[in-house]
Amino acid sequence: MDYKESLLLPKTDFPMRGNLPQNEPVKYKQWDEKKVYEKMKKNRVGCPSFTLHDGPPYANGNIHIGHALNKILKDIINKFHYFEGKSIRYVPGWDCHGLPIEQKVEEKIGSEKKKELPKSKLRQLCRDHATKFVEIQKDEFKKLGVIADWENPYLTMDFKFEANIYRELCAIAKQGLLIQRSKPVYWSWAAQTALAEAEVEYEDKTSPSIYVAFEMSNESKAIHGLENKKAAFVIWTTTPWTLPANTGISLHPVEMYVLTSDGYIVAKALYSKLKEEAVINGEIVTEFEPFMFESNIAINPLNGRTSKIVLGDHVMMDSGTGAVHTAPGHGEDDYKVGLRYNLDVIMPVDAYGKYDETIVREKLFKDTNKYLGLNVFKANELILEELGSALLKRVDIRHSYPHCWRTHTPIIFRATKQWFISIDDKYGNKNNTLRENALEVVENLKFYPEWGRNRLKAMLEGRPDWCISRQRDWGVPIAFFRNKKTDEIIFDEKVLNYTAMIFEQKGCDAWYDLEIKELLYPGSGLNPDDLEKTLDILDVWFDSGSTQNAVLRSRNYDAGTFPADMYLEGSDQHRGWFQSSLLTTLASSEIAPYKSILTHGFTVDEKGEKMSKSKGNVVAPDKVIKEYGSEILRLWVAMSDYQSDLKISDNILKQNGELYRKIRNTARFLLANIDDLEEIIDVSKMGPLDKWILNKAKKVFDEIEAAFNVYEFSKGLNKLNNFLVVDLSGIYLDVCKDRLYCDDKKDIHRLASQSAMALIAKKLISTLACILTYTMDELLEFAPAFIKDGCEDIFDFKKVELPVVESSLDESILLSAKEKFSEIKDALSKEKVIKSTLELMLYTNSEDILALDEVEASDWFLVSQVSKDKQNSDILGSFQIDGKDFEVYKATAHKCPRCWKFTANAEESLCKRCEEVIK
């Protein structure tokens, strides 16, 4: 007789295969139609809130794997807090102004046509370009399963947004921190604009490393009794092109200096090194304290101009000569020491990085004709020739040098008139500097990982004033009126407010389109003819730094609370958005914009190498989604230690695919075996093994939640994977199969195991909903009603807590006994003594095993019987655990044709249990 129909075999419509690439878009469309973001808001009315403020990606080009990592991690954290019961707000945004977009438009229309276009037309083309890529990227982000307020994103080019950026600028001006001055700044000659620190990237470059002698003037030699003797300061530089603008030589204020027998002056601390390198050859003749040279004069060998000897703390003793070539127009330290000593600031380089008429006017070269209009980097070799015998040594070195982030060309330091936010002027209620306020705030923030605190602190401690002006067309103008006669900037509050109002109504294009009389506040009492517009635009980092005001503090978006609970970006944003947002908020209102900062690393290939098209190791999100589905990408993010660089490749994605299948199959097995369960029974009615797995699950899921609470998702998922593979699938689900399939539908053993499985299934859905949202939604769709609990979809699902269950079992003894038994079983199988463990029975005098009832004990070892009585038959194997005996025998009863256990009284007859079930 075939008893298969009488078995309660697993049954579920939940598919074994996810078919993620096909099913995810369908599911997301359903979510969109149901407006799940709005539903999430309604579901958490009156609940504690969590606000993650989105750092805006740039609206240019398709998203790359770094974007996917960032957005998925944000989505996981938002959903984690949501499923924990919090009300979340997530307004996505885009950075829409700036050089990259302007360059793309220029590439499209050509540089000549760009020059002919009215500024308003060019700006419209830039706006169109940004709008196009906002829509493209929005669609790409949705494909990652990200839930957000996609209907109401923030765009930095929206009129109201531009007005609020401008208002933030005005608030900073009101605090007295906005200053305009001529100062050396990072300058991209390829893009013809100033750059902020965050727009500078370091790449390797080959430069001439040169040592040059500056002979002391006769008057200065006379002061030291060196008349008619050679005495020259030796400077070291890797930028020969800056030598024409030299106006000083900086010495360390306390280090000793020496004059050598061959007539050169260097720091005593560096003398031996310089002699070893054959820069100088003479012995030490005289020692000097540095103050003895202060305000002495040396002669620039390139042009015969004077160079004042000054003292500066910036002079280092780890390299060079201890005598630093000082050109205040070409460096921050040079500029600062130049201010103290009133050194001339000479700037002979134009916006295109070429020598201009200044070299003629100031006689910076003996023959200016061959340098006029020449790119400074191309001038290096000519300058070295002109130095003649003053060039003591030249070595070409490969070193890290600042480059423009967009054009990837080496930049220069160039003194120009720019707008700055002062970092070290006192202001506000505390009468602190912006730097002091920022450093104080950083001490009170939470950082994930913790090392981010010191990194941000170090950058704030060392940063210069923030140069916020750019000489380009596509951006928010620094829209002030200047008095033509007095050069005074008009900071009248009513005038500024009126400009902001116009920007809100017409956009900041109005600054270019309208006449001054149309832009000027009617009641200002100012004559439009006396005024001119300032035409620089704002650094895009100021745009993104202002999002805290334009998004979180304005009433234009339902974006959550201010300050935000979290900012989350790549680790490069310690020098970017984390700083720009902090500095703008503190400068305008002395408040920190965020309570915590989480940073992630960069994406690299499986060898840890940077991705590039030339290497062919780029992993495109779109390709991954089409091949694997976004769930696998989301699992990769969650399983990676994002605090360092994240490796990704086809192999790594396949490994995550395997993990996904394990999770899916385990979940499917749980669903299939609780299909006919009507309600979860009380824990008190469960057996020891059911209580053991629930006790184990409770501990594991509590550990997972603790890890998730500090955003250590990989740690939590590794614990989950271990539990699913080892404890749940490897042991519990295996030992339950007999009772699930063969017991009566209402048998207490079966109901207890089903109930334990149902509780674990609910907790699994609750825990993984933030990561595998598509799959958990699908799982819920096929789950029994008592798990759904009235939920329409996963976004209605509430946090599940497993019951606290005391387990009396000694897990270590049970597991050790199971392991030892498995060794004997494997040997018997290998020797073909048995085909199945059900052919065996086990004797033991272990109280821990006998504490289980007979059914649970035999199920634990997957044998037909566990007895406290020794058998008379042959012992097939034995072992001891904790001093207790275990003996393995062949089962003496007959095989039951229904459950296959050797517990039947006669051949081909049913065992007692199966007989009762069939009746």
Curated annotation (Swiss-Prot):
Q: Decide whether keyword Cell membrane is in the record.
A: no
Q: What is its EC number?
A: 6.1.1.5
Q: Give the keywords, sorted.
A: Aminoacyl-tRNA synthetase, ATP-binding, Cytoplasm, Ligase, Metal-binding, Nucleotide-binding, Protein biosynthesis, Zinc
Q: Does the keyword Repressor apply?
A: no
**Cofactors per UniProt?**
Zn(2+)
Q: What residues bind L-isoleucyl-5'-AMP, as annotated?
A: 569
Question: Position of motif 'HIGH' region?
Answer: 57-67
Q: Name one GO molecular function term.
A: tRNA binding
Q: Where is this motif: 'KMSKS' region?
A: 610-614
Principal localization reads cytoplasm
Q: Where in the cell is it found?
A: Cytoplasm
Q: Which GO terms describe its biological process?
A: isoleucyl-tRNA aminoacylation
What this protein catalyses is:
tRNA(Ile) + L-isoleucine + ATP = L-isoleucyl-tRNA(Ile) + AMP + diphosphate
* Entry GO terms, CC: cytosol
Which residues span the membrane? Answer: none
List, alphabetically, the Pfam families matched: Anticodon_1 (PF08264), tRNA-synt_1 (PF00133)
Q: How is the cofactor bound?
A: Binds 1 zinc ion per subunit.
Its biological purpose is as follows: Catalyzes the attachment of isoleucine to tRNA(Ile). As IleRS can inadvertently accommodate and process structurally similar amino acids such as valine, to avoid such errors it has two additional distinct tRNA(Ile)-dependent editing activities. One activity is designated as 'pretransfer' editing and involves the hydrolysis of activated Val-AMP. The other activity is designated 'posttransfer' editing and involves deacylation of mischarged Val-tRNA(Ile).
* Domain note: IleRS has two distinct active sites: one for aminoacylation and one for editing. The misactivated valine is translocated from the active site to the editing site, which sterically excludes the correctly activated isoleucine. The single editing site contains two valyl binding pockets, one specific for each substrate (Val-AMP or Val-tRNA(Ile)).
Query: Subunit structure, per the record?
Result: Monomer.
Family membership noted in the UniProt record? Belongs to the class-I aminoacyl-tRNA synthetase family. IleS type 1 subfamily.
The record's section on PANTHER family has: ISOLEUCINE--TRNA LIGASE, MITOCHONDRIAL, SOLEUCYL-TRNA SYNTHETASE
Recorded protein name is: Isoleucine--tRNA ligase
